[in-house]
Every structure is written in C-alpha cells, then in structure tokens.
A protein has these predicted regions:
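N-terminal capping/small domains of soluble enzymes
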Residues: 1-123
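Hydrophobic faces of well-ordered beta-strands that scaffold small-molecule active sites
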Residues: 31-39, 67-71, 102-109, 137-141, ...
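Secondary-structure boundary/capping motif
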Residues: 46, 150, 177-178, 207-211, ...
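Generic hydrophobic/aromatic pocket-lining and core-packing "Φ" positions
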Residues: 58, 92, 128, 155, ...
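Structural recognition of alpha->loop->beta junctions
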Residues: 59-67, 125-137, 183-201, 246-255
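Active-site beta->alpha loop and helix N-cap motifs at the rims of alpha/beta catalytic domains
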Residues: 73-188, 195, 205
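Secondary-structure transition/capping motifs at alpha-helix termini
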Residues: 100-102, 160-164, 191-196, 220-227, ...
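Catalytic alpha/beta core domains of metabolic enzymes, predominantly
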Residues: 203-261
Length: 261
C-alpha cells in the first residue's frame, strides 16, 4: 500500500528498514522495464549497439522476467542508417522473430520522429502503423514540452491498432514544472487519449527522493489508483536507486533499469 506524503514525512526509510520493513499485507510487486537495448547504449555509446550485439544478449534479457523490454525510440532508426549502415526495421523484425513472447516497447518523439522538423499527420500515422506491423504491441509517445497536442494522435492511433499505450510526462526543474502542472497534464493525457499507463520520464536524471514525496502522489491523484504509473530516471547524480525506493513506497508500479552496454 502506498504511503501518503504525510506518512513519509514522519517515517524515514531508515526507520522502516530498522523495523524490519513493511508488514506482509503491505507488500506490492514492483515491475521492472529493462532499457538496456535502447537507452543504455543511447546514453553511453551514442546508440552504437549493432544488431548482432542485441541478438547476442536477447536470450538473457528476454528470460529475466522483465515486464517490458524497451527497444527503440526514433534515434534507434537514425543512427543505424547514418553510422552503422544497418536497416533498423530489419533489426526490429529479427528481434521480434527471435523473442515472440516478449513485450518490446517503442517510443515516438513528439511530431518530429527522427528529424528536427514538424512532420505532417500522414507521416506520423504511417510511422505508428509500421511500428505495429513490425511487431510492437507497446507503443508510447513523449513531447519535451509536455504539449499533449503533439502526441495525442500517436497514442490514439496506436490504441486503435491494438497496442498497449503509454504517455510520457517529461520531468524538468523550473518554476513552471509544479505538481499542479503534472496533475493537469496527466489528466489531459488520460482524458484525450485513454492511455493505458503513464510514464514519468526523467531523461536528465534530475529527480530526487524529496521531489518524489509530492510529485508521485500528485500524479496518482490525477490518474487514480488503477492506471499503472512508471518512473524512468538516470543516475547522473547517483540518487536514482534511492529515488526508485521512494517511488515504490509512494505507489509507482514499474521502474526502468538497465545495465551498461
């Protein structure tokens, strides 16, 4: 059972662990979404993992019990063509053929895809249709400015095709990025796209345990208790393990992890 912010403010994690942890009836399963094949090499190797590298790792990754395996965002289509001289769609097909029972994820970036231009609706729609046709059954979308107009069509179409969908809330530190902003954006995502789950996306590694104390309950209040909520962060400050512990205490359902390539 998730703690309220008031409970967290009066009971530290050290006190919880010293007492032997939570009572048995408060235990929850926290699921793991692996990002080794997508974000790990994107962040450390500039997305230079080749198809042969992925295929070598595939058995271990797909048999580890992860809820989903993150495989591509638009940059995983750009780099193979530009630098590796590989066909990214062929990579996607090979991976799905080798592990047909694994839920691989794809993510769509705003209205840009793999470019820096705003693309027309028919191009966005064709991209989403090709993702689904090539095996993806979990499709999400994000916009760096949390402009839901830029991702709503993607999520609606993906769901119409039969995919499980996730909408991202991009995290940032600024006077604008208040709890209320995330409440408003989460509600808009759910109301406009009927999304299947929400991801708090912290690509900059800026989340802290203290920030989670109000942010996660705020988002949860907006989306209800039944819609899965996941957190994606990076360990640039070294705080991500503790941030994830607080996320679990506060009611997050899934966390994103990876290993170095």
């Amino acid at each position: 059972m998730a703690l309220s912010p008031e409970e967290l403010s009066t009971e530290s994690l050290a006190e919880i662990f010293a007492a032997g942890g939570r009572p048995a009836d408060s235990e929850r399963e926290i699921k793991i979404i692996d990002t080794t094949l997508r974000d790990a090499h994107q962040s450390i190797w500039a997305t230079r993992m080749r198809t042969e590298h992925i295929m070598d790792l595939l058995d271990d990754v797909t048999n580890a019990g992860f809820e989903h395996v993150d495989l591509v965002a638009p940059i995983q289509f750009d780099v193979p063509v530009r630098y590796l001289r590989e066909d990214p769609w062929e990579r996607v097909r090979k991976v799905h053929e080798a592990a047909p029972n694994t839920k691989f994820r794809s993510m769509v970036r705003s209205r840009n895809l793999a470019s820096f231009d705003f693309l027309p609706d028919d191009v966005i729609h064709a991209w989403v249709e090709r993702l689904y046709a090539n095996g993806f059954r979990v499709i999400g979308a994000f916009d760096g400015l949390n402009d839901i107009d830029n991702i709503a069509d993607t999520l609606i179409l993906a769901k119409e095709l039969g995919a499980e969908t996730y909408g991202c809330l991009s995290y940032c530190l600024s006077p604008v990025h208040t709890d209320q902003l995330y409440i408003d954006k989460a509600q808009e995502l759910v109301e406009r796209t009927d999304v299947d789950r929400i991801m708090l996306k912290d690509a900059g590694g800026l989340l802290t345990p203290d920030r989670m104390k109000t942010l996660i309950p705020a988002i949860r209040s907006a989306i209800g208790n039944d819609l899965p909520l996941e957190v994606h962060t990076h360990s640039l400050t070294g705080l991500s393990p503790l941030t994830y512990i607080y996320a679990a205490e506060l009611g997050v359902d899934s966390i994103h992890t990876s290993i170095a390539p």
